[in-house]
Every structure is written in C-alpha cells, then in structure tokens.
Amino acid sequence: MLLAALLVSTAYGAGDETRAAGAAPTAANAATQALGAARPRIGLVLSGGGARGTAHIGVLKVLDELHVPIDAIAGTSMGAVVGGLYASGFTGKEIDSIVSSLDWQDAFRDRPPRTDLTFRRKQEDQNFLVKLPLGLRGGRFLLPRGLIQGQRLSQTLRRLTLPVAQITNFDELPVPFRAVATDLETGDSVVMGSGDLTDAMRASLSAPGVFAPVERDGRLLVDGGLAENLPIDVARMMGVDVLIVVDVGFPLRNREALTTAPIVSNQMLAILIRRNGQLQRATLTANDIVIDPPLGEASSFNFGIVRDAIAKGELAARGMSARLSAYAVDSPAWERYLARRSAAREAPPRIDYVRIDPGSEHYREPIEAAFEDLVGQPLNQTVVASRV
C-alpha cells in the first residue's frame, strides 16, 4: 500500500543498531537535570508481553502519583511502546487515556475502514474472498512475511510521537530511552538508541508471523522478546544506580491445555522467554525493585484485557509503594520535572517537504500536489489525516 510520508523539520538520522546503543547517556536529560545530583539515577525496565504489557501503564500512574522521577527507560515489545510514549513526555494517566480509547482492532487492520472506501472499492472488497495480500516475483506468488503489515499501527505511533519526531538521539528525549528488537537473520538482540522513534517501537513490537518484520539499517527486525524480553542489562548500561523492573511475564499452560500444535509452539516460546528473563533477574541487586503484576493466564493477544491489566499494574505498584517512595522527590521538584518533560511536546514540528515512500512516478505528482500547500507550515495532524 502506498504511503505518503510527511517528513518534518529535522531529517531522521540512521540508528546505531548495536549493543553500544545501550551505553550511558553522555549527560543527564533535561527533565532530571532540574532535580539536582544528590539523588540516585533511576532506570525503568519494561518487559514484553503483548496485551499483558499494558499493565506497565498502571505502574507508571503510581510512579507519577508517588513523584518518582525516571532517568532512563529500556523496553521490549509492548514495554517499548509504553516506555517510548512515557519517554516522549506523556504521563501515565495520558497513556492510560490513549490506550483505553484506542480501537485495537482498527490499529491492527491494514485496510481502511469500509465506510471510507469508494463504491467501486466496496464492490472489489465483496468480490475477493482472499484478503491476504500476495506478491509476485519471478512468475511465482509470494506470501507476506506477516499477517499484519502494521501500517495503521505505525501511523498511530507516529501521530503520538510526532512532537518529538525531530529527536533522533534517544538520549535527548525527555527521558533517555532504549528499545530492544531481535535480528531475524542472526537472532541477536538489537538495542536501538537512535534513529526514528516510531520505527524503533514498531520493530520491537513485531511478533514474528503476526507482524511483518521492520527493515532498519539493513537488518530485518522482529519482536525483542525473542532475544531479550526483560532488558535489565540494557538499562544498567544507561548509567543508572537503581532499577525498577516491571515483568508482566508469559504464563505456562498445564498439560490439559496443550491440545494443538500452535499452543505447543507458543508454550515452547514462552519457556525460552521465561528462561532468558530469569537469567536477567538473577543480576538484580537488593536495591533494585521488581514489580510483577498479577495477570494470571491473561492472553498476550487479547486486547480486551487492557482495562483489567492497567488496574492490576496499579495494584502491584501500590503493593511496592513503601519501597518506591524512598526514591520520590518533593512537590516543587516534581513540578519542575514535569515541566521539563512536557516542554518537548509543546511546539508542533514544521513540514519541510513531502516524499512518497516507496517512490512511484505514477503516484508522486498527484500526491505531492495534494500536500504541497502544507510545506513550511506547522504540522496539523487532523488536516494531514483528512487528506491521506
């Protein structure tokens, strides 16, 4: 599907997709500089877990209530999405509102809503029984790399992170941030600390087989949970003194539930992910705090659990409030911290040019003409969405 991409004032830089991307930020970020140096630097680790990962939002709400400032965030999969939004300057309550109001079925759908189709397109929609997109190479049909290409999800993430889109060094976000993905060809963990924030979040969330891989800097990236679902070592490398680790986990099914090949395959994957997480947890110290939301056997693919997951995240964090409060700051310091965090989101970016990606001479001129009057203007997302 052709995508008209509007690139804003500062061109996106290439990401340094190596373990070196997890190195400590060279300077304190703007938000925590206002708090002074006489406090430990706090790192937040958010695990992967699909829909279960929305429990992270409840934890963030409690951290905000307790006035616990975060100096660095490392996240995997849904932890990278929630962590990326928080690092962009959103509060826990704001992320709760965003996620709770999001139409997840629509976000995971590549096709536009039927109500937006022309009459001819609606007829075509009825005529073709197979909705799966097919490719053609060398006279042979090709199946897609994932059931979901993820274009609408990427659009949603880009819209939310647009105010910080010009920031290509994740250390310069309101809170320094790292997202973890897996190189599909090598199986290596890929730590993303620069480049396009939306692409980093989207790559970390790309469950193989479900979402198409994201190509970034010449590498095919999928869900970071395969290589490092609980990126404790990544956060530690960001120069923090104390870690707050939120692990939503992957439940293992009992023998009676292991009834089909896909379920058995998922069980094997869950075992591998849990084992890697246990190795990471073994590196924690007595000063670190671990929060395990009581999610039971809730499915990673059921986004109908979002409200309950957020509530259970809050419950688990409140259960650790005595320890968390030890790292709280007073109200004046917290207000300064919030002001610095939100500053990056105040001014909308400016549109410098319009580029069609992937390029197509057939579509280029009419699409560029549809947007040319917006060049040089502050980006109005409503106007852009209506023209797309």
Model-derived regions: residue spans:
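Bacterial N-terminal signal peptides
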Residues: 1-10
